[in-house]
């Protein structure tokens, strides 16, 4: 009788652990970087990395909704990791959105022709030195960026926002990569929410 109870107890513990692992794999942890719309041209804001879950992880994804009113006159960061300046998301006067390691400018991923005056859903997946960029649920660029720079993020860093005529909403830093199906589902779900 006692072996039977011990066996059932062990089975319940194992099943609970498996369900937790499966849940955490399907639904990665998110760190809300912004829970409201920010108007960038009111100044620079920063968020300390110690407020994020697993901030120095070499595998992560960043998702955000971006609304650009007008293009800047010079290359301007939407966000960057400071003070290391290891990675930045930058918009330039030629309407090119670039995710790059700031130390080696030739290593970058780009999205061209960002629509102005409408919400655009951007996802950046980073796995060591492999980077993928998505816009509105579609893969637009992928490649490698030197892991020496892109993964040199430290707890002393913060995410610093630039000063441009734009809004950002729902920025999340996920502890895992987002797959294409998840990106598309989130795009269509949030797209409907932003219309209201």
Question: What do the predicted segments below correspond to?
Answer:
Residues 1-196:
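Extracellular glycan-associated modules
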């Amino acid at each position: 009788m006692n072996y039977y109870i011990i066996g059932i107890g062990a089975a319940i513990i194992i099943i609970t652990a498996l369900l937790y692992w499966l849940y955490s794999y399907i639904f990665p942890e998110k760190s809300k970087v912004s829970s409201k719309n920010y108007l960038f041209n009111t100044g620079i804001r920063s968020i300390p990395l110690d407020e994020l879950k697993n901030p120095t992880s070499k595998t992560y994804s960043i998702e955000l909704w971006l609304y650009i009113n007008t293009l800047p006159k010079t290359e301007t960061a939407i966000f960057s990791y400071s003070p290391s300046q290891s990675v930045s998301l930058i918009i330039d006067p030629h309407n090119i959105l670039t995710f790059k390691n700031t130390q080696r400018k030739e290593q970058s991923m780009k999205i061209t022709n960002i629509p102005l005056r409408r919400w655009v859903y951007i996802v950046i997946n980073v796995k060591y030195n492999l980077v993928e960029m998505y816009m509105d649920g579609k893969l637009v660029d992928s490649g490698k960026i030197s892991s020496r720079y892109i993964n040199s993020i430290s707890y002393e860093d913060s995410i610093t926002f630039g000063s441009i005529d734009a809004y950002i909403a729902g920025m999340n830093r996920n502890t895992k990569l987002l797959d294409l199906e998840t990106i598309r589902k989130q795009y269509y779900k949030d797209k409907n929410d932003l219309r209201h």
